[in-house]
Structure formats: structure tokens, C-alpha cells
A protein has these predicted regions:
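Structural signature of beta-strand start/N-cap positions in the alpha/beta core
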Residues: 5, 31-33, 72-74, 95-98
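Glycine-rich His-Gly loop
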Residues: 8-11, 79, 104
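Active-site loop/oxyanion-hole signature of alpha/beta-hydrolase fold enzymes
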Residues: 22, 36-76
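Gly/Ala-rich beta-loop-alpha elbow adjacent to hydrolase catalytic centers
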Residues: 76-85
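Conserved alpha/beta-hydrolase catalytic His-Asp/Glu region
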Residues: 110-111, 135-172
Length: 172
């Protein structure tokens, strides 16, 4: 599209990707230049073997706006990714115009430091075979379908199979 830029940023659930915005991209493109970013390790982006931290995502957002969009932009962001955009805006105010937050997670719930149990869990999940096994169990086809039926579907008897497939593929 043509017009002022809008950057779309997906939620940070395991299958999160730019596909989340598919139903509104064309409408937004009638009046805006639309950018749909898959954050590092998500969707169609490379899934390298690094530990993805909040800083990595904040930097990726700022770099994308600077190097790809090249001007102050509006951002529409979903779920857990809201905190990354808020921090990116805090760090580099000149890159952002308006921010629309869809289903934001409470920032106060995100400020907690990991305790001993969380640190142990992280170490266990970083063990190559064990961590991969647990991850694939969490994002198996059945687990994704159940998650959609129980938590995401407006009509659980007629789930959006294309969205489920996109979520599953983005997680793998």
C-alpha cells in the first residue's frame, strides 16, 4: 500500500507469526504502507540456536524501523510482544508515532525476576534432546488444536483450520 507506515508485530506464543494479521493487512494497505514483521525465532524468520532475550526483540524492532521502514511509524502489536514495543519506544522515541496494543499482557506481571525453579527449568530446557522433546510435545498438532478449541476459537465447533495450520507451521 501507500501512505504512512504501519508495522504489525505478532504475539510471542510458540506459533506466533505475522500470519496473525492476515485478515486486516489488505484493509490497512488501502491507506498505509504495511510492514508485517516476524520477530527473530518466530514465524518465517531464522530459528538460530541462541537464547532470545527481551533485548534481542527490542533491538530487532528498532533496527527494522531504522533500516527497512526508514521513518517514524505507527505500530500495532499483540499480546506478549507489547512489552518489547514499549521498551523500544522508551529507548528510541523518534522511531515511533502511535502504538496500538491488542490484548496486552500486564506489564507488572512481566517485571518479575526468575527464581530458582525457573532457572532450573530453563537449564533443563536448554539440554538439547530433552528441551526439543518438551517443545515438540507442547506444540504438537494435537496440542495446537486443543489450544485453539479451548482458548482461541470464537466457535470451537468450527475452528479456523488455516490459522491452526499456520500456528503449527510457525512453531516448527
Amino acid at each position: 500500500g501507500k501512505g504512512s507506515p504501519i508495522l504489525l508485530i505478532h504475539d510471542m506464543l510458540p506459533g506466533g507469526s505475522g500470519y496473525e494479521w492476515g485478515k486486516i493487512e489488505d484493509d490497512l494497505a488501502l491507506e498505509h504502507t504495511v510492514y508485517n514483521l516476524d520477530l527473530p525465532g518466530c514465524g518465517r524468520s531464522e530459528k538460530s540456536g541462541i537464547t532470545y532475550t527481551n533485548f534481542v526483540y527490542v533491538q530487532a524492532i528498532c533496527d527494522f524501523i531504522k533500516n527497512v521502514i526508514g521513518e517514524k511509524t505507527d505500530v500495532i502489536v499483540n499480546g506478549y510482544a507489547v512489552s518489547f514495543v514499549v521498551m523500544a519506544c522508551h529507548n528510541e522515541k523518534d522511531l515511533f508515532n502511535k502504538i496500538m496494543m491488542v490484548n496486552p499482557v500486564s506489564l507488572s506481571s512481566l517485571k518479575q525476576m526468575p527464581g530458582k525453579k525457573e532457572k532450573l527449568l530453563r537449564r533443563c530446557l536448554e539440554i538439547p534432546v530433552f528441551g526439543t522433546l518438551v517443545y515438540h510435545m507442547v506444540v504438537s498438532r494435537d496440542a495446537v488444536n486443543n489450544e485453539f478449541i479451548e482458548n482461541y476459537a470464537f466457535d470451537p465447533f468450527h475452528p479456523d483450520r488455516d490459522l491452526q495450520d499456520a500456528y503449527y507451521e510457525a512453531a516448527h
